[in-house]
Amino acid sequence: MSKIRIYELAKELNISSKKLITLLLEEFGVEVKNHMSVIEEEDADLIKEFIEENEDKEEYLEDKYKNLPEEKSEKFKKNAGNTVKIADKNKSKQDKAVKDLNEQVSKENHKVEIEDTITVKEFSEKIGKPITEVIKQLIFMGVMAAINQEIDFSTAEKLGEKFDITVLKKKEDIDKGVAEQDEDEDEDTNVEKRPPVVTVMGHVDHGKTSLLDAIRKSKVTATEAGGITQHIGAYTVTINGEKITFLDTPGHEAFTAMRARGAQITDIVILVVAADDGIMPQTAEAINHCKAANVPIVVAINKIDRPGANVDKVKQELTEYQLVPEDWGGDTICIPVSAHTKEGIDTLLEMVLLTAEMQELKANSNRNGKGTVVEAKLDKGRGAVATLLIQNGTLSVGDSIIVGSTYGRIRAMFDDKGNKIKSAGPSIPVEILGLSEVPAAGDRFHQVKDEKTARDIAEKRKQKIREEYLQSTHKVSLEDLYNQIKEGKVKELNIIVKADVQGSIEALKQSLQKLSNEEVKVRVIHGAVGAITETDVTLASASNAIIIGFNVRPDSNAQAAAEKESVDVKTYRVIYNAIEDIKAAMVGMLEPDYKEVILGKAEIRQIYKISNIGTIAGCYVQEGKMVRNCKVRIIRDGIVIFESELASLKRFKDDVKEAAEGYECGLSIEKFNDIKEGDIVEAYDIEEIKKKEL
């Protein structure tokens, strides 16, 4: 880096070298030896900025530097050289004009943003404080850092507190192209009504696909092996001139997996319940998933054409899950339907549109497209294929998009019927070709100005987005629950309860919910009979919940998923223990207590000094026992003079594990040789005890 001499800089600034030398010392804490000394060009730029800011204060400069003491001038002339160093003395006063400027800066900027590290000089400039003040505070903090040395974020944060300035971590601008576009377009108020996105959920064999088939008026079920949905699809239907987009349910796992990734794509859930079967375990799971995601539910009571169908019984069961039908005074829409005879289908769709109208779903189609990946796969003939749900804007063939850490230019676009289309608007599902890699379901996509921008963002995201996503939500565990409550990270403790019998679930739910207090609310989001499954872990991960199992164990898949997702799974055989552990965690009682246990006492009766070994004490065990490698304290005249560990323990010439009461032994103390006859060696151990009572 180039350097500049003092006299050259003074000439540029049109001031004397003497004034410049004094300015450097008093304003920047930099001591130079004489006019031939050199400084870095970047430091010279700072000085120029300072002079320019004060150029209309010429009288101030003249008054300050015209009467420069002779002794100071002499000091600068001594030991001529070319070095520059930070002055390590504390200045007695600061220039009034600079103070006024600093006060103004601090009033206007109480917050500054920095990256992971910052140099001391850059930090000084950011907060508008003289470098000497910053270095002085660092020294008080025990950090010895020169002007160009870097400090980390935590140090900068503490340093900012010294100046009453909040230091924030600057988010890495890897999505600059996307962010700029969003800022420009978010101001656009040209929004219009968009179709609702509906997911169909329910228990196996309750007729989800048949209902969707009836709605679409096409025989999808007949083409699928065993009547089981083989793929995740998205379809659009039209009723009374209005569109509804259906996601052919990916099942509860994918529903919650998407939500765990931050992708909320469903506006309304149609919950399918068979009239002749009632609420089943997967139905209950679906209800809990919807509640956790805060998605409105429209209940379709299916198979009303079958003998044994009992609509009222289903409605009664729904009330147990706080879903009270409208005709019973509640706010849950329940529509009896038959996928077979198509009875009630139109009414169901009208109710979906009514629910959507209440939600006031809006989007702006006159902007660049963005949305979520519903499914993606690698096709041998076509490459990476992704089904996208456009949530805002319009997407067209030829557009460049960024999808998670993948990018591409749309080569072809197909609608839900497989027809080629050129563009699509909000709430419309499309299948696209042209991505560089297969994205993950739940990834967000954004349209950007060109493929180069998309590629640059994707490359940066590949380095950071995955780890940031995994770290974005800190999973709750009993061990650190108290700390998270205190830090304000946890306001609500979500719990999933699995047990061997229904009675145990009810008992646990009631007891756990009674633990709620002002700081944290305990909420049982799901309870079911049976082993802990991968589905439970997925829900726990999405809802940041703890899983409690009573007389049940997680299966191998659930264990692997829990480890991968950092979900806390606790199993118990006694309900009381589960309640006490949650209670203890909430008040911070899972931190262990330590208790000292006295093992024994021995009196030193003879001293042996052995070269290369040290001092050996011949002892008589008066109480308890002496144990090899145990902790000991040396007591002389009732006063503890040293604490250490037993280095060795012998009886006669043999090493022994312990010496019992009434026996003699020889021992040596780790790192201590100043023992005397009559000293007492007290052996003890530290036991860890977990508190179980509040």
UniProtKB/Swiss-Prot annotation:
Location of this chain's protein in the cell: Cytoplasm
- Family annotation (SUPFAM superfamilies): Initiation factor IF2/eIF5b, domain 3 (SSF52156), P-loop containing nucleoside triphosphate hydrolases (SSF52540), Translation proteins (SSF50447)
Region (G2) spans which residues? 227-231
Q: What does the UniProt keyword field contain?
A: Cytoplasm, GTP-binding, Initiation factor, Nucleotide-binding, Protein biosynthesis
Residues reported in the UniProt entry to bind GTP: 202-209, 248-252, 302-305
Q: Does the keyword Protein biosynthesis apply?
A: yes
Outline the extent of the tr-type G domain. Answer: 193-362
Gene Ontology molecular function, alphabetical? GTP binding; GTPase activity; translation initiation factor activity
Q: Tell me the segments the record calls region G3.
A: 248-251
Question: Where are the residues of the annotated region G4?
Answer: 302-305
- Cross-referenced Pfam families: EF-G_D2, GTP_EFTU, IF-2, IF2_N
One cellular component (GO) term of this entry: cytosol
Note the Gene3D superfamilies from the entry. Answer: 1.10.10.2480, P-loop containing nucleotide triphosphate hydrolases (3.40.50.300), Translation factors (2.40.30.10), Translation initiation factor IF- 2, domain 3 (3.40.50.10050)
Q: Does the keyword Cytoplasm apply?
A: yes
- Region: G5, residue numbers: 338-340
Function per UniProt: One of the essential components for the initiation of protein synthesis. Protects formylmethionyl-tRNA from spontaneous hydrolysis and promotes its binding to the 30S ribosomal subunits. Also involved in the hydrolysis of GTP during the formation of the 70S ribosomal complex.
Q: Which family does it belong to?
A: Belongs to the TRAFAC class translation factor GTPase superfamily. Classic translation factor GTPase family. IF-2 subfamily.
**Which NCBIfam families would you find in this protein's record?**
IF-2, small_GTP
Protein name per the record = Translation initiation factor IF-2
The gene name on file is: infB
